[in-house]
Swiss-Prot record:
GO cellular component, one term: virion membrane
Main localisation: virion
InterPro entries: P-loop_NTPase, T4SS_component
Compartments, record wording: Virion membrane
Protein name: Protein P9
Amino acid sequence: MRTTTKKQIERTDPTLPNVHHLVVGATGSGKSAFIRDQVDFKGARVLAWDVDEDYRLPRVRSIKQFEKLVKKSGFGAIRCALTVEPTEENFERFCQLVFAISHAGAPMVVIVEELADVARIGKASPHWGQLSRKGRKYGVQLYVATQSPQEIDKTIVRQCNFKFCGALNSASAWRSMADNLDLSTREIKQLENIPKKQVQYWLKDGTRPTEKKTLTFK
């Protein structure tokens, strides 16, 4: 009697779509609200680098504790937010551990809050660079937030297919995002936010024209 063996799913799949998001804006511009609107936080695999505790996920407060959790979960379910000192060393270890459990057959959302605190300008640091360049085909879906787009690495800017731009408050930030969104700095500034009611933002999807959108709060 012939028996069949279930085909093992490869760890990488180069055909997976690029859904990486770069989420840029000053404090109160709607970055976290946009991410909450996009991400299923009840999903099986959601991780966050979350220094300011913006997201409702099980909280981990040391790299050692995070490492134990990662080793226990492997390619299985894992949901947590890591809140530690925002140093490049800690962030690199976070990225290294996240990449180790990334798998095309088990998609995983990875949120990075305030990248400018831990990123290098220009080329990405080694493990962050690996996660941002290779993560897509390993099933990683990145949501990378920052208030200072001019202070982050160019690697992640190139890798993100979706670019969100909320209100900004510096000329260098306006210029940086104008270049990335194919808009003028004047257009970048034309966003109307109403406290507790709405935020407006620009969103670019790949090569499509940048669109102005509104997120309302109930």
